């Protein structure tokens, strides 16, 4: 078991960081490669635990998968249609295997998935969407089993609620359906747009992505192609917050400002000088006062829930107090008690947290509870006085590519150590 050992400092986190490809686009794209009858190449795929698990799952299903810079996938030889518990128990994204399997092969089964413990994220919306396309779904022995006689059939589907995961499932499955599918109340996240762009690159006919109505004209087969994964807007935002709370100056390269406009607006409101270019974003907090801001998470293009923990920390370190309202997931304030162990000030009332006016943080032993919460704890350790030990960092490895190396390049004193060495 590995942990992060961080020696805190009042030194600003400053410099340049290259942003990786987006995990939340890479995973559905890798699963969508199951739709392709010819080889595909996916570039800018981040090196993450969930990506490794997905590649292993694709191999288990019979695909040929290799990584040499880009990820190369040949799914022409897929001969197994079950995503087993031992592979998917740690990763909720595994449900994305179901749509491509039933769409291309007429059958598929996926063990009910695991992942971050941040509240209920049921697969009901995925199941209902596939049923509307004509699939028969059964829940047996911990598995979601889907079958269809012949091809799926295009349908007019209105999502009961906005869901990124279910939008991806239906969109991918509908590419090989007979007829046209219209998906209303669809999620609008950039990662959905990127997944649709990949599907079109291999021969699909998807339009309207990025709006709340996506149209998919079914085709008989999908071939091969090349796609480069979009930049990770959450990693971008995380490093911008790290610079902001430490009074630093940073340039995030290989990223796009339009991916996180709501986050940039809140950083400017907090007092940061934010500049943008075609493929970079800079933030300068030098000599500026950090001000608390009010945040309300909501589906894209509003403020993303995956940046809530980082802005909770920002508010804790800012002048004044800010109100954080979490509307996407319940139970997503688990990082706050850990930050309070370091001396942070916050009050939680239901889905609202009031944070601010913390007079410095002190190093402590803290425990990561989910992916984004762990990022806020790591940043807190960088700016705290004394030593911080962050436990359960396997959470952070699910979503951040070499975070300790990137923070070290910005001036942080952080190392990955085995529990036996502490």
From Swiss-Prot:
GO terms for cellular component: cytoplasm. The keyword Cytoplasm applies. It catalyses: phosphoenolpyruvate + UDP-N-acetyl-alpha-D-glucosamine = UDP-N-acetyl-3-O-(1-carboxyvinyl)-alpha-D-glucosamine + phosphate. The modification 2-(S-cysteinyl)pyruvic acid O-phosphothioketal is found at residue 116. The active site is at 116 (proton donor). UDP-N-acetyl-alpha-D-glucosamine binds at residues 92, 121-125, 161-165, 306, 328. Disulfide bonds: none annotated. It is found in: Cytoplasm. Its main location: cytoplasm. InterPro entries: Enolpyruvate_Tfrase_dom, Enolpyruvate_Tfrase_sf, MurA_subfamily, RNA3'P_cycl/enolpyr_Trfase_a/b, UDP_GlcNAc_COvinyl_MurA. PANTHER family: UDP-N-ACETYLGLUCOSAMINE 1-CARBOXYVINYLTRANSFERASE. Cell wall formation. Adds enolpyruvyl to UDP-N-acetylglucosamine. This is UDP-N-acetylglucosamine 1-carboxyvinyltransferase.
